[in-house]
Amino acid sequence: MLPLNVTITQITEESPLVRTFFFDHRFEDMDPGQFVMVWVRGVDEVPMGLSRNNSITVQKVGEATSKLFELKEGDSFGLRGPFGKGFTLPSRGEKVLLIAGGVGAAPLSPYAEAASAAGAEVHTILGARSAGDLLFEWRFEALGDIYASTDDGSKGVKGFVTDVLKGLDVAAYDRIAVCGPEIMMASVFRLLEERKVLEKAEFSLHRYFKCGIGVCGACCIDLSGLRVCKDGPVFSGIQLLGSELGKYSRDASGRRIKI
């Protein structure tokens, strides 16, 4: 699949290191949690979750994202997708808990809106380093209860999302969706396993992608052969039992590295 050339229509600075890029194309058939391959000309092609059907939200962490931060309204980049398996939408009347850490709030925000539109009750645990880093807080607040945690205590609970989670009756929720740094997700995974509600949970994983369509195998996890780009990026908690979640990732050569 050749990249679709899109033009930037608006750039919103969410924080000093996070920006949302709106573009002149809508992926009307996207499933919340799916990703696109973003082609930054002359640099690289990298996977990113969609924060709306016409936007990506980018954290400046490397060469490709740094180059994106140099772009202005009217500039263009390439997109392939959407790819992969998204989050499972709830049924009317179900109670959903979202657990987002940092920029992991980006793919969870359209899921929250879709879940609410489907008639579900949506609650969110939103974690970040400080109050100014709580991404899309207003979008989640518009849909239901929100619980914040910050590393520095500038808003909500001082600590991590797990500190908030420990105080909730997780058994009362029908579905739990998690996205954020893998160390955070691994901590949430262990807590949900202890509470015996892992079968209700889905986790969005990030791995090094090359093709994005399940051919090259660069993003396979463990010995299971599960491909993050094709079988995921969203996996059920049961699928991840005994996996390398929170322990290992892989570099561009496919070598397993400690997280």
Swiss-Prot record:
InterPro entries: Cyt_c3_hydrogenase_gsu (IPR012165), Dihydroorotate_DH_ele_sf (IPR037117), Dihydroorotate_DH_Fe-S-bd (IPR019480), Dihydroorotate_DHASE_ETsu (IPR023455), FAD-bd_FR_type (IPR017927), FNR_nucleotide-bd (IPR039261), OxRdtase_FAD/NAD-bd (IPR001433), PyrK_electron_transfer (IPR050353)
UniProt cofactor(s): [2Fe-2S] cluster; FAD
Cofactor: binding comment: Binds 1 [2Fe-2S] cluster per subunit.
GO molecular function terms attached to this record: 2 iron, 2 sulfur cluster binding; electron transfer activity; flavin adenine dinucleotide binding; metal ion binding; oxidoreductase activity
Binding, [2Fe-2S] cluster: C211, C216, C219, C229
Subunit structure: Heterotetramer of 2 PyrK and 2 PyrD type B subunits.
Family the UniProt entry places it in: Belongs to the PyrK family.
NCBIfam families (UniProt xref): PRK00054.1-1
Protein name: Probable dihydroorotate dehydrogenase B (NAD(+)), electron transfer subunit
